[in-house]
Amino acid sequence: MKTPVSHFLTTISALLTIGIQPAAAQPFEAVGMRALGMGGAFVAVANDSSATWWNPAGLATGPFLDLALTRASGESGDALPASRTGLWSFSLGTPPLGVSYYRLRITDIRATSPTAPAEAGREDRAAGVGIRSLSVSQFGATVLHTITTGVSAGATVKYLRGTAHVRDLDGTDAAGAIADLLDEGDDLSGGDGEGAVDIDVGVLAAMGAVRVGVTARNLREPSFSGRRLERQVRAGAAFDAAAAGGLPLTVSLDVDLRRYAAATGDRRVVAFGGEHWVRPQRVALRGGARFNTAGEQDRTVTAGASVAVRAALFVDGYGAVGAKTGESGWGVAARVSF
């Protein structure tokens, strides 16, 4: 008879055998104000409705109901290649089910000349830049299954509708400010939408104060006009001091188990963070950092907070600032949780 630990390890092993191919990515660090305030170290923590994105199994440890409306934006734009991700989302979790809608706009620009330097200036960009923008609407349904006491598995089956937009610029048009070029990419319209069905899966083991999880996203790697949403696998661990009779403090660590291609280069992220409810169920503070161990090896520091404006109604927010690629981000959400 298998123990809970062996069940958990068997599931992890199955996820790790999934092959990865380099492609454009839909970033983990696009969704969830709590997650982003903690630097993106959330796979083992995910217990609100953003678990529909971060780790479907996390809903098993969540409240009776969690509902969030979110607006967020992230950008890496000091030099080429540069990118921006914008998000509007609705998510709802009420174990053992969840539903979600994520609307993302992923825009990137890069020099079209193969000889252009990585930190291309305006003169270098005058030779030409390519602008790519992918708008994706994702509708998801999340279901849970209890493997054994303290160990759950979850899956989000999702329908995606995506439209890719491409434009090449040269001369003075290409030499504009990077922020203006990203704005132009965000404004691209037209094109034919394409639909695809995909699935995210995850497992979570919660044993006392210790939580361990692993999740795999975009298993079928859908593509839209040649832009593929790359499969990603991430593992996380967390310690919940309150569950051990201590402070209402959670610390966490996440690690990408495979590198993946993003607009600004290859990524393989290590993230850590913490969440402290300085006034339980009223005020929470968060902080974290993440490091890219591949590609540009950029570093990003994040902070966030939640404030209850009335019982069970929270306003969540976060901000991020980074080095190397000039990454920055912000987000705000209204969340009902009880």
Where are these regions (language model features)?
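Loop-centered beta-sheet repeat module
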Residues: 170-225
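Flexible, surface-exposed loop regions and adjacent strand-edge segments
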Residues: 109-120, 169-178, 229-233, 305, ...
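A gly/proline- and charged-residue-enriched helix-loop-helix capping module
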Residues: 102, 107-144
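Extracellular loop and loop/strand-boundary signature of outer-membrane beta-barrel proteins
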Residues: 124-129, 183-190, 221-225, 259-260, ...
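Transmembrane beta-barrel domains of outer membrane proteins
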Residues: 50, 54-60, 89-93, 100, ...
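Outer membrane beta-barrel transmembrane domains
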Residues: 204, 209-216, 223-338
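N-terminal, post-signal peptide beta-strand-biased segments of exported outer-membrane/organellar beta-barrel
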Residues: 21-106, 220, 292
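Residues that define the transmembrane beta-barrel architecture of outer-membrane proteins
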Residues: 50, 82-88, 93, 135-139, ...
